[in-house]
C-alpha cells in the first residue's frame, strides 16, 4: 500500500500544470471532501484546492469596509 501512495505522489509532478487548475464550478460539484481526499492521495499538488470556495475568499471584498480616500 505504501508503494501505491508513492506512485501517486511521483505521478503528480509528471502531469502538466494545467491538470491542477480546475474551473470554479468543480468546487460545488465535488466539495471539500473530495479535494481533501485528493490532497491525501496525490500529495501537495492539490493543496491549492483543499478548501471549498477558496477562490471566493481571494476576490470577495464586499465584507470589508470602504477605504478612506
Swiss-Prot record:
Subcellular localization, as worded in the UniProt entry: Mitochondrion
Keywords from the UniProt entry: Mitochondrion
CC terms in the record's Gene Ontology section: mitochondrion
Source superkingdom: Eukaryota
Main location: mitochondrion
UniProt-recorded name of the protein: Uncharacterized mitochondrial protein ymf27
Species in which this protein is naturally found: Marchantia polymorpha
Lineage of the species this protein comes from: Eukaryota, Viridiplantae, Streptophyta, Embryophyta, Marchantiophyta
